[in-house]
Design a protein with these regions (language model features):
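DEDD superfamily 3′-5′ metal-dependent exonuclease/proofreading module
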Residues: 1-152
Length: 152
């Protein structure tokens, strides 16, 4: 799992403005600032970024920042799609929010990034346990789809 950084952005519902940014490298080094410039420095030369629902949520805010800075965008791994693929028996695939005990308490993007990292580790273990034929079937069907391409 080397060289993956897990990212989470907190965005206001009414203005769609990023209000908090968190990230965790695969070696567990955290980042917690509301600065895209500093996030890009933290992500410098990282080949992969990951997150839970990163393709449909966080990437829409991150992509313009990479373009604006003239930076290469890392490849994307979305733990949400891997979760539904590797844990089909689960009723839902959202990250647990057990650290959010009060209804009005805002999400912590560093905690969510760490949860994505831990989920990805579970997903890797689940994939390794799959029958080799099922791995080949998954590869044949999914190796060129944006949602799970990076697994292969």
């Amino acid at each position: 799992m080397k060289d993956i950084t897990f990212v989470d952005l907190e965005v206001t519902l009414n203005t769609c403005r990023v209000v908090d940014i968190g990230a965790v490298r695969s070696d567990r080094t955290p980042f917690h600032e509301n600065s895209f410039d500093n996030l890009l420095l933290f992500l410098h030369q990282v080949p992969y970024i990951s997150g839970h629902n990163i393709l449909k949520h966080d990437l829409s805010y991150l992509k313009p920042q990479f373009e604006k800075a003239g930076c290469r965008q890392p490849k994307i791994i979305d733990t949400l799609y891997l979760s539904s693929l590797l844990f089909p028996e689960k009723l839902h695939h959202q990250l647990s929010k057990d650290d959010k005990l009060q209804a009005d308490k805002s999400n912590n993007p560093v905690n969510d990034s760490l949860k994505s990292l831990l989920l990805f580790e579970e997903e890797q273990n689940a994939f390794e346990r799959l029958d080799s034929m099922l791995k080949m079937i998954y590869y044949g069907l999914l190796h060129d789809t944006d949602r799970v391409r990076r697994l292969f």
